[in-house]
Amino acid sequence: MSRRVVVTGLGAMSPNGIGKNNFWTNTCNGVSGIRRISSFDPSSLSCQIAGEIQGFDPSEYYSESDLKKLSRAVPLAIAASKEALHDAAIDLTQFDEDDFESLGVIVGTGGAGSVSYTHLTLPTILLV
């Protein structure tokens, strides 16, 4: 038995655009999100450029205390998922609990979470 999968909404959080419309416009116009790293001082690194997402406020999704425990990827994924649901005109308040089994959001990331891993292992490495 095969079942159809239908993509009805999109969301994007990317170095070259926050939101699917900004992302698509910048992509079509050849706008790159690669810049000199600004989230920390990269002067001691051989590579000082990266694709950082600029202008995103994770406190719109989580409290400051929660943000200290989460990877930056989590609020980005939530924001993209919310945009995809909005783009699909899906109002979650109109769903019964049983309806959620027929709804899915697929999230993809490229290397997100590696900063959190470094944050967790760095103190251990320095103590050795």
What are these regions (language model features)?
Residues 76-88:
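Stable alpha-helical structural segments in soluble proteins, enriched in small hydrophobic residues
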Residues 83-84, 105, 110-114:
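A short acidic, glycine/proline-enriched capping/turn motif at secondary-structure boundaries
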Residues 1-66:
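ACP-dependent fatty acid/polyketide chain-elongation machinery
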Residues 15, 115-116:
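Glycine/Thr-rich phosphate-binding loops of Rossmann-like dinucleotide-binding domains
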Residues 69-74, 98:
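Active-site nucleophile and cofactor-binding loops and adjacent substrate-binding regions
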